[in-house]
Amino acid sequence: MNRKKTQRRLSKWLLGAVLVSASVYTPITGGQAVAAKQSYKAMEAGINQVITSQRMRGTKSSIVVREADSNKIVYQYRADQGVTPASNVKVLTATTALEVLGEDYTFQTDVLASGPVKNGVLNGQLYLRGTGDPTLMERDLQQLAKEVRQSGIKSITGNIVADDTWFDTKRLSPGIYKSDETHYYAAQISALTLSPNEDYDAGTTIVQAKPTKNGKPAAVTLTPHTNIVKVVNRTRTVPKGKPNTVTMARQYGTNTIIVSGNIPVNSSGKRQWVTVSNPSAYTADVFKRALAKQGISFSKTTKVSRSKTPANAQLLATKKSISLYYLMMPFMKLSNNAHAEILAKSMGRAVYNEGSWDAGLRVMRETVQKDGISLKGIYLEDASGMSHKNKIPSEKISEVLFEAQTKPWYPTFERSLPVAGINDRMLGGTLRNRLTSPLVKGKVLAKTGSLNHTDALSGYVKTKSDEELIFSILTEGVKSTAKPDIDKMVQVMAAQ
């Protein structure tokens, strides 16, 4: 299995984050703590000025600023008010996963045979059993297929069976709208799923359209290729200089992706991540193709199906994922929703032997409570922040951020947070184009959050006087976006 490229990329995530943290953002802990300023009046006035501005009028906000070393609240505005946190929910998901599952946690994917093998023929089913690995890629399935061939199997009479029973069968959280379902951020959650590349957007396929000759349809491809998805190509190549109007969307309730619009000659075309309905079947189908490439043949009746693996099935091959220590980087830097929901179900499975949202969210609430944080004002419907019904007060998120500093896994959590103004997406993540002034660039580590009319930012900021503050800013009911206003507040904190 070729892991060198993956490991280099993961190492870049870690090394880059460490360098930024070491050279720009040095956390203040223990003996490094500097004396807190006696007065935060200037900061208070500055934040209040933003809150009362015309842009923020009518916005529901909850804001808390704490000293990172003492936990003393130095500013608060409706701190106990529950506000839709968007992806700031991931602060709870990430810290809980590190606490419950641990940094060394990995996902395992197995291939097992049920039935006798005689003269290279498996007279039975071949099972692909998953436990939620969001990093599983086509190349991993190719390696597993190679190991099946090396075990002596040359032909299979039964089905290629997807075993996704590690999780329940509920694929989408309640906060997902029908209009969201085609988009990568609303991928279906399954214990057996596949990512098209190293961004690890599990449950999606990359659809690419490239121009051909003028007047002809564009060339449309899927990565990875799968027979589960049907592509309807309604594109047309148009002369150079014409606008690119190509759209790509999966029809609701189907695995049909409609690609339509005009694509100019000599243009780069368009590439988009589109979700797949039934990720288990998608993964098993790509695995079946990998088996065929290894020269393994099938009977005329062999198909992709779904079932639980029998207890007496023979293990043929295993693939373990990268550890949570590594996964935290793409999860938090890129705010990956599928990772959040998979981790929630994994926590439910680990603690209550139930891979469901109910069990996973229960674990999250209980873990927060164990740190002495009240659940008052907290309501969770998912672990990614997609639901507008999620509610968390800023004081709770800031408490979680404070308690995280006391944990042995804190360096991993800290490295996973986007770094303000750092252009490399593997470092800056969702903050790479924000807070770019010298006052704050590289000095803010924070989780972003954004939904329609909802913006949030929670994390750590190094001030001008070398003090570290914890902050949580949650806003909803914004007419357009509160991001500029949130950034102004953080700059006010940094100037302290």
Language-model segments: which ranges?
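Sec-dependent N-terminal signal peptides of Gram-positive bacterial secreted proteins and lipoproteins
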Residues: 1-35
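Beta-lactamase-like hydrolase cores
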Residues: 25-69, 75-81, 142-151
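Solvent-exposed, polar/charged alpha-helical surfaces in well-ordered, non-transmembrane soluble domains
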Residues: 41, 45-49, 92-99, 139-142, ...
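Conserved serine DD-peptidase/penicillin-binding transpeptidase domain
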Residues: 51, 105-357, 362, 366-371
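Loop/turn elements at helix/coil->beta-strand transitions in domains of secreted/extracellular proteins
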Residues: 59, 156, 339, 376, ...
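Active-site SXXK
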Residues: 71, 85-103, 160, 192, ...
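Small-residue-rich helix-loop
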Residues: 74-76, 137, 344-496
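A short glycine/serine-rich beta->alpha loop
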Residues: 78-83, 273, 386-387
